[in-house]
Regions:
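Short, C-terminally biased terminal segments at protein or domain edges
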Residues: 1-120
Length: 120
């Protein structure tokens, strides 16, 4: 089994998760089981899918899980936007989270291409 924790993209995803939790802790109580929980689950799934993909034996399986991760990343990007527009996120938190999401997206895109090339 590959050590996913050595991947820079997983490390960035993990840091994103750690920064998202305090950013969402100030959301209204009414969102605890709504947007707060949804954003947290989505963010955790990003690192989880990278880890699961790297636990797979075949490169095409890794690529599939990385594609799923890209979808979760887009979902989180939208949720961060909604949270900002509802006034739940401070401008600095929105900017920080969005920049991290975009960087992880670039890293994932490169990794998907690399994994696909290895499986061809």
């Amino acid at each position: 089994m590959s050590d996913f924790k050595k991947l820079n993209v997983w490390q960035e995803a993990h840091e994103l998760t750690l920064s998202l939790y305090p950013a969402t802790s100030t959301f209204p109580q009414s969102e605890l089981y709504g947007l707060t929980a949804q954003m947290r689950r989505c963010c955790v799934s990003i690192g989880s899918n990278i880890a699961e993909g790297y636990g797979r034996a075949r490169e095409n399986e890794k690529a599939r899980f990385l594609q799923i991760t890209l979808g979760s990343l887009s979902e989180l990007e939208y949720q961060v936007l909604v949270a900002r527009d509802l006034g739940y996120l401070f401008s600095k938190d929105h900017e920080d989270l969005t920049n991290r999401i975009l960087e992880i997206g670039r890293m994932l895109g490169s990794l998907v291409n690399k994994v696909r090339a290895a499986s061809a």
